[in-house]
Amino acid sequence: MNYTLSTVSSATMYNSSSNITTIATTIISTILSTISTNQNNVTTPSTYENTTTISNYTTAYNTTYYSDDYDDYEVSIVDIPHCDDGVDTTSFGLITLYSTIFFLGLFGNIIVLTVLRKYKIKTIQDMFLLNLTLSDLIFVLVFPFNLYDSIAKQWSLGDCLCKFKAMFYFVGFYNSMSFITLMSIDRYLAVVHPVKSMPIRTKRYGIVLSMVVWIVSTIESFPIMLFYETKKVYGITYCHVFYNDNAKIWKLFINFEINIFGMIIPLTILLYCYYKILNTLKTSQTKNKKAIKMVFLIVICSVLFLLPFSVTVFVSSLYLLNVFSGCMALRFVNLAVHVAEIVSLCHCFINPLIYAFCSREFTKKLLRLRTTSSAGSISIG
């Protein structure tokens, strides 16, 4: 299977682009309305109750918490007593949203894996697509934890699973950006340097690069995993990141690591690759308009779903540095990070649409697989 830029028909790309744009707009509108409703319904409690998920990058270190045995531990950087974050993660709307994204992501990525296994991995692009799909499934694994946390209204799965929850999210985040970048570099080489790049655009190189990405992503995710733990606050156990005063430098390091390695470097490479691709296509005798549409679709969707998370994490770093402060600012930052996190998780089911279902070749194989399955003679492997 070769997911080249030329395998997509103009009509298919137009319809796919419109459908994906519509889906993305609907998802973001739903998220914003759900979170906005929760924000309006929140009342300031007399005692602080933390209702954050993995997205809470500020609350845990802007408040002084006290444990049940009255051994208090100070984790404040800015003294804002009883400043609630204004994000209710236990609402029915948010639970429904998590469930929907989970099933869509699971279903879409399993279909991609099934097709890849049936028709084998033949090219470096197939290898990157396989690993991108596995990365999205890692993202999908975060949702059962978030659902449990929202329904149970506290964490009772222990420290180990708490850390793995954080690890799943950030390995999935770094992997997704890395494999999107590698796929873009491969498209760049195929279009701009088609002959010179043939010796390195092989399945073997794809395997090596994929292993490197998984190792590097795990290393990049390790620091924040160390700070994720379970703590009891006012009788309720929470699983999220806790920083004490001495760990402020680590918080800033992790925030800038997310921005530099998770967005700035990949986005710079993406923009360069697609700029060169578009220039090459425009000056070539066979002006491949289908490929240009595919290029814009990839860039727009990548930025739409992943850039907001990095931007809001950067804003939370500014809060840490006291560029701005106060309860209202804290609530805004937490809400922004929370929405951006959910938007980033949505790409786990959008990616199969972009990199697979927009490909005429993939669609043919999927239909062939469905026909074979209906006949009862399908063999996966």
UniProtKB/Swiss-Prot annotation:
Q: Where are the transmembrane segments?
A: 92-112, 127-147, 166-186, 207-227, 252-272, 295-315, 337-357
The residues exposed to the Extracellular compartment are 1-91, 148-165, 228-251, 316-336
Among the entry's GO cellular component annotations, what is one? host cell plasma membrane
Q: Where in the cell is it found?
A: Host cell membrane
Q: Please give the residues the UniProt entry marks as glycosylated.
A: N2, N15, N19, N41, N50, N56, N62
Which keywords, in A-to-Z order, does the entry hold?
Answer: G-protein coupled receptor, Glycoprotein, Host cell membrane, Host membrane, Membrane, Receptor, Transducer, Transmembrane, Transmembrane helix
What topology in the membrane does the UniProt record assign?
A: Multi-pass membrane protein
Q: Which GO terms describe its biological process?
A: calcium-mediated signaling; cell chemotaxis; immune response; positive regulation of cytosolic calcium ion concentration
Pfam families xref list: 7tm_1
Function of the molecule: Putative chemokine receptor.
List the PANTHER family hit by this protein, alphabetically: C-C CHEMOKINE RECEPTOR TYPE 8 (PTHR10489:SF627), CELL ADHESION MOLECULE (PTHR10489)
Name of the protein this chain belongs to: G-protein coupled receptor homolog Q2/3L
Can you name the source organism? Sheeppox virus (strain KS-1)
Q: What does the organism's lineage look like at the top?
A: Viruses, Varidnaviria, Bamfordvirae, Nucleocytoviricota, Pokkesviricetes
